UniProtKB/Swiss-Prot annotation:
Protein name per UniProt: (+)-T-muurolol synthase ((2E,6E)-farnesyl diphosphate cyclizing)
Source lineage: Bacteria, Bacillati, Actinomycetota, Actinomycetes, Kitasatosporales
Highest taxon of the lineage: Bacteria
Sites marked Plays a critical role in the stabilization of intermediate cation: 80
Compositionally biased residues, Polar residues: 402-412
Natural source organism: Streptomyces clavuligerus
Amino acid sequence: MSLNHSDLMFYCPVDDLPHPAASGVNDRTLDWASGQGIPTADRDAGRLRAMAPGLLAARIAPDARGPVLDAFADHHTWLFAFDDEYCDRADGSGITEWASFLARLHRVVETGESALLPGNPYGLALRDIACRLSTYTTPAQLAEWLEALRSYFAALVWERSRRRDDDRLQSLDDYLLLRLRNGAMHTSITLLDTVNGYVLPRELRETPGVRALVEMTALLVSVDNDILSHHKESTSGTREANLLDVLGRTGHTTPGEAVAQAVALRNEIMRQFVRVAERVRTPAAVPELYRFTTGLARWIRANLDFSLTTTRYTGPVTERAALSPHEVPPLSGQGPAPARSDVIGWWWRIPEPLPEPGSDGADTPVRKRRAGDRPPTAGRGGAPHHQRTGPPPPVLPGGITASRSSGLQQSTWRREHR
């Protein structure tokens, strides 16, 4: 595989912000997994321990603390173990049994009735996570997480049926549609406000700009994983859908060209993420919106940092990949054009300017601020701390915002010290 340095330059204008207690988070989640009996094979348990899954959760939420962070980390550890034991090794048969198992697994989490999957450690472990999360979420937040989990399982059924039929995803749009959901990203994104101690109002989460940012985050992380994990998957014989394979088949490219095109594709999506985020984070935006969009950006950077150092992904790409806070020039020549995609092209067609939340007179939780004001730190429920009565719940020690001096295009996302 012949690759130039520029072919492996990942555009990511987000600062690295490690968690000061990351090793403790990782130790606790590994102890939890061991106590739950996942993975079930000693060899897989050794691999899970070596990859240090808790470091990813700690990077995603570098200011989170306490039991809610542990529950968040355990959820990601569960996803890693479940993916390796149930998804990567599927032989493509038993689609009916697979769908039934996932339906029962979701019902165990939804109702707590473990008898639906008696003795299954993954069902019991996920039920444990759900019970702990319910302590920190509102009913709406928990329902949103359960719905994201249902969507993830539905995508896994489609993926298994594709394997059974030896369907190689004939188009890039087929791939994009599958990868928006089969990476379980939405199950994590729905918990970003919970783990950081605030509530993003549902009416803000459903605005076009925020919906687009959520989808971009989910796809960016999945695409980055495809690029960085391709060597592992190609040598282990997995039949997972991978962007490099799709580009190779649809564009008749060499492996090196497929990597270059994949990186160019993700860089274009990253550029659009920055553009939309800059439009969403207006002076009138509530602090919860600032924190949520920053959380999305942190997810993208955390995944890159984790993937480039974990034992889970090793190979020629991870050894040579680099991150750049500056825009990477688009790939010259032919390649995928995401803005023309029927699946994700709408990200480039969001009306501009975006309507201000609450501008139509609706009763929305928007507090107008003067341009240049810092977004106040908000507690659970969305109100600034100085408006709350009683002791506030643990929150970030400071707001996290983009640099307001030069805009997101020219600057990185960084903590705003007070």
